[in-house]
Amino acid sequence: MPANQPPLYLTFLLLILLYLIITLYVWTILTINHKTAVRYAALYQRSCSRWGFDQSL
């Protein structure tokens, strides 16, 4: 029955909303991961250089 089906624009709106939510979610995760990765890399580099410096002394 066609009465049970929601209007086409409503379906499109729902799909767009879902797409936006997923995109935002993925973008946030990637940004957070990138920031933490950079932070960890900097810490690792610092600790390694310090360790190497201590060993040379």
From Swiss-Prot:
InterPro entries: SH. It holds the Pfam family SH. Its main location: virion. The chain crosses the membrane at residues 9-29. It comes from the Viruses. Keywords: Host cell membrane, Host membrane, Host-virus interaction, Inhibition of host NF-kappa-B by virus, Membrane, Transmembrane, Transmembrane helix, Virion. It is found in: Virion membrane; Host cell membrane. The keyword Membrane applies. GO terms for cellular component: host cell plasma membrane; membrane; virion membrane. It is a single-pass membrane protein. One of its GO terms (biological process) is symbiont-mediated suppression of host NF-kappaB cascade. Residues 30-57 are intravirion. Belongs to the rubulavirus small hydrophobic protein family. Plays a role in the inhibition of the host NF-kappa-B pathway. This inhibition occurs at the receptor level, by preventing the signaling of TNFR1 as well as IL-1R and TLR3. Interacts with host TNFRSF1A, RIPK1 and IRAK1; these interactions interfere with host NF-kappa-B activation at the level of receptor complexes. Interacts with host protein UBQLN4. This is Small hydrophobic protein. It comes from Mumps virus (strain SBL-1). The gene is SH.
